[in-house]
């Protein structure tokens, strides 16, 4: 019983961090994978889709063939279905060949539908197939095929060189004959194998011999089949022409040929027998011919959280009865979730004192610039009139945090006498709600989708004034003249008029995958998933060089204000580094306790958000951690600051607003139904983007959500100007007006946008597709 609880706890812990290689849940090794699926709609155009899943693969194969090994595979996005993972034993097998196999099997499934419409004695099915890229391994990532596991005797009925099984059944042979006749002798489907009439791993021969992999033998394959095939009663039943008689135009079959040939055109197969329009090596999809080629890895983890919760749910069911889990909303069930009638309690953010010089490694001595004001931060006790906060213990059922309230202790007092009191409302499971005004403390706001409850305003200036007037508090505040990493380039958008409806792609710069980006008028700097910093010429629009910076993926990169040649990077290797770009050398290095997802600089303060659920405040003069802000229940994905306020967004769907003078929480913004991936503060407004496919706009004067913008996909990154809102929403670059929030433009970039950076009227978008796209628009 104790072991099962441990397994469930391990699964819960993994919800708050990137899923690492070879973690063990209930005795099973698990890892992340990109899952690629091919679908064919009624328009007969193939379309690739992908998601990140959690998989468990048995090391020892349960079957071996001449070309591949078969392993039991568990995909936690389909926890009730057993799968087979197929790995090629040929070292020369390419990544594209796995996608070609999936295309052939999906293509044959379309032919099987037509075969079944003819009402044969036994219908047939080609198993759905997938491609899994195991992304927790060093590049190039291992790849395997996947399909459902079917119990029974596996048999090969024929192959691509004319072989026919001695106990050949009628149905598989007639299907090969059917494909040959119904395509007007343009193609032939062979290598029929599987369990009963569930088929897999087919091969397609085309008349020209082009496309569909190296197994396509062209007319040689036709000849071998014709030599060995013997028509059977199913062939007669389907009224197929006897095999060795010439037939060119007239088909006696009962199925329409035109629709199938339209499908051939959709994938590039010419009806005149000239074969595929492109030699099928996935370039067809890469060039946009009917579908999007899976050319990039998407580091987003849309379904991982839900899958890991399934793991935990299984373990809880085995151990003891437990209340049903409320699943993390995903892109499939947005706006359908119902809030629980009785919200559970949740820990209140607390300050954890962590003075630490030991985790800072000095690479080379650097003299900080002289400042008039002393901003050295000291670790001190919070003033006695600060709030005292009590938090309930977290439990394994605390999964849905949308309506969790923060419990305040009865002996709470006001943060400071000058701060405005804010009402905290809590709703009971019956109907009536009561609100009480306390001077105490952190508040929890219930933000409804349509009508947020009124709150008293947050006043950054008041908080700053109170901090300066409170002599007993030694916690410094940001300087009055604030310089942040969000505002380094002078912004002309306040003075110019832009026509954002005219936005267009003006260039694509090849070079490096980009998860994050920053820059200035001369250079751009991007961070990639292989730990390299990409340096780009922002004027000539070309890739300059790469710098090996981290052992794992770089999650954030920003310029240090006031230091033209210094940038900071943060990575999945738990390191934050400051670099001199001229020398390409590390100046300082911070070792965090967990993966660092986001960093932000304001004045001489560095804020880091990590997978350990905390936000840390660092003095950049001494690189000491002067404050740790705790309270989120899952990984921090975004932080930003404005004046004396700090904002943090998390996988727990919450946005916390912190008072930097005291390190206490002023309020938490609720309403998102997915991970909060990006925050942007602009003109006393906070813009938040989430995996629930929405952007929410929060008025910091009233603490209300004043608008919710529905996007096309999960929102990964935002950039806000005086004239427009730019959002990276899946594969889409979307632009919204700043005043009415109207959708001005939506452009498909064919690769998920992970980062944005703007220089005047040029926008740069980065993805994992090894390029930067450059966008521009007209001035009015």
Swiss-Prot record:
WD repeats: 507-546, 549-589, 591-628, 631-668, 671-708, 748-780
Pfam family name, one: WD40
Catalytic activity: L-threonyl-[myosin heavy-chain] + ATP = O-phospho-L-threonyl-[myosin heavy-chain] + ADP + H(+)
Residue intervals of the Alpha-type protein kinase domain: 40-243
Signal peptide: none
Domain of life: Eukaryota
Alphabetized GO MF terms: ATP binding; myosin heavy chain kinase activity; myosin II binding; protein serine/threonine kinase activity
The enzyme's E.C. designation: 2.7.11.7
Annotated Low complexity bias: 337-350, 380-436, 458-488
GO terms under biological process: chemotaxis; mitotic cytokinesis; myosin II filament disassembly; response to differentiation-inducing factor 1
Described function: Phosphorylates threonine at 'Thr-1823', 'Thr-1833' and 'Thr-2029' in the C-terminal tail region of myosin II heavy chain (mhcA). This phosphorylation is critical in actin-activated ATPase activity of the myosin and regulating the assembly and disassembly of myosin II filament. In vitro, catalytic domain phosphorylates mhcA, myelin basic protein, myosin regulatory light chain, casein and caldesmon. Drives the disassembly of myosin II filaments for efficient cytokinesis and recycling of myosin II that occurs during late cytokinesis. Can be activated in vitro by autophosphorylation.
Subunit text: Interacts with myosin II heavy chain (mhcA).
Protein known as: Myosin heavy chain kinase C
């Amino acid at each position: 019983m104790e072991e099962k609880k441990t397994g469930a706890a391990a699964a819960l812990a993994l919800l708050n961090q990137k899923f690492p290689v070879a973690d063990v849940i209930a005795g099973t090794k698990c890892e992340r994978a990109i899952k690629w699926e091919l679908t064919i709609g009624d328009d007969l155009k193939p379309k690739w889709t992908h998601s990140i899943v959690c998989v468990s693969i048995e090391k020892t194969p349960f079957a071996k063939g001449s070309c591949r090994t078969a392993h039991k595979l568990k995909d936690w996005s389909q926890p009730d279905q057993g799968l087979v993972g197929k790995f090629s034993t040929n070292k020369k097998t390419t990544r594209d060949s796995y996608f070609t196999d999936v295309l052939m099997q999906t293509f044959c499934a379309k032919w099987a539908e037509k075969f079944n419409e003819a009402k044969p004695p036994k219908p047939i099915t080609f198993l759905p197939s997938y491609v899994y890229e195991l992304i927790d391994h060093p590049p190039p990532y291992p790849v395997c095929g996947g399909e459902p596991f079917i119990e029974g005797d596996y048999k090969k009925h024929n192959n691509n060189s004319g072989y026919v099984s001695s106990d050949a059944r009628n149905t598989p042979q007639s299907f090969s004959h059917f494909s040959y006749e119904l395509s007007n002798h343009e193609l032939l489907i062979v290598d029929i194998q599987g369990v009963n009439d569930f088929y897999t791993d087919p091969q397609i021969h085309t008349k020209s011999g082009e496309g569909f992999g190296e197994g396509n033998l062209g007319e040689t394959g036709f000849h071998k089949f014709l030599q060995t095939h013997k028509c059977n009663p199913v062939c007669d039943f389907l009224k197929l022409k006897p095999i060795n008689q010439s037939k060119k135009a007239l088909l006696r079959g009962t199925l329409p040929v035109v629709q199938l040939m339209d499908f051939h055109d959709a994938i590039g197969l010419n009806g005149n027998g000239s074969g595929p329009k492109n030699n099928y090596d996935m370039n067809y999809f890469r060039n946009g011919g009917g579908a999007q080629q899976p050319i990039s890895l998407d580091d987003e983890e849309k379904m991982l959280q839900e899958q890991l919760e399934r793991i935990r749910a299984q373990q809880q069911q085995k151990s003891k009865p437990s209340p049903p889990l409320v699943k993390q909303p995903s892109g499939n069930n947005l706006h359908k979730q119902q809030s629980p009638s009785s919200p559970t309690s949740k820990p209140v953010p607390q300050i954890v004192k962590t003075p630490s010089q030991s985790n800072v490694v000095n690479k080379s001595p650097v003299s900080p610039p002289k400042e008039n004001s002393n901003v050295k931060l000291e670790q001190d006790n919070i003033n006695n009139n600060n709030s005292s906060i009590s938090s309930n213990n977290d439990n394994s059922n605390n999964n849905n945090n949308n309506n969790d309230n923060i419990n305040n202790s009865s002996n709470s007092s006001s943060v400071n006498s000058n701060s405005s009191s804010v009402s905290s409302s809590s709703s009971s499971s019956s109907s009536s709600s009561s609100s009480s005004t306390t001077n105490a403390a952190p508040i929890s706001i219930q933000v409804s989708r349509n009508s947020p409850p009124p709150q008293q305003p947050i006043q950054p200036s008041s908080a700053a004034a109170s901090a300066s007037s409170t002599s007993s508090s030694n916690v410094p505040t940001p300087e009055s003249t604030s310089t942040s990493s969000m505002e380094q380039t002078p912004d002309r958008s306040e003075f110019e008029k832009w026509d954002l409806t005219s936005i267009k792609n003006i260039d694509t710069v090849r070079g490096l995958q980009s998860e994050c980006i920053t820059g200035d008028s001369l250079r751009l700097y991007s961070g990639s998933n292989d730990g390299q910093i990409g340096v780009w010429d922002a004027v000539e629009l070309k890739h300059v060089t790469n710098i090996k910076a981290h052992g794992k993926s770089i999650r954030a990169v920003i310029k240090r204000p006031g230091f033209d040649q210094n940038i900071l990077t943060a990575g999945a290797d738990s390191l934050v580094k400051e670099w001199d770009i001229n020398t390409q050398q590390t100046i300082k290095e911070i070792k965090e306790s967990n993966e660092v997802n986001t960093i932000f600089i304001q004045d001489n303060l560095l804020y880091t958000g990590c997978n350990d659920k905390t936000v840390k405040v660092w003095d950049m003069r001494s690189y000491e951690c002067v404050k740790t802000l705790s309270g989120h229940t899952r990984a921090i994905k975004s932080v930003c600051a404005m004046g004396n306020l700090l904002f943090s967004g998390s996988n727990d769907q919450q946005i916390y607003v912190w008072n930097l003078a005291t390190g206490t929480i002023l309020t938490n913004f609720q309403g998102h139904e997915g991970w909060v991936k990006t925050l942007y503060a602009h003109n006393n407004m906070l813009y938040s983007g989430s995996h629930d496919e929405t952007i929410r706009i929060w008025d910091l004067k009233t603490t209300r959500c004043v608008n919710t913008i529905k996007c096309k996909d999960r929102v990964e990154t935002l950039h806000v100007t005086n004239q427009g809102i730019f959002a990276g929403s899946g594969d889409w670059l979307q632009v919204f007006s700043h005043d009415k929030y109207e959708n001005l433009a939506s452009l498909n970039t064919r690769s998920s946008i992970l980062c944005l950076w703007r220089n005047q009227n040029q926008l740069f978008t980065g993805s994992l597709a090894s390029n930067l796209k450059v966008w521009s628009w007209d001035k009015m």
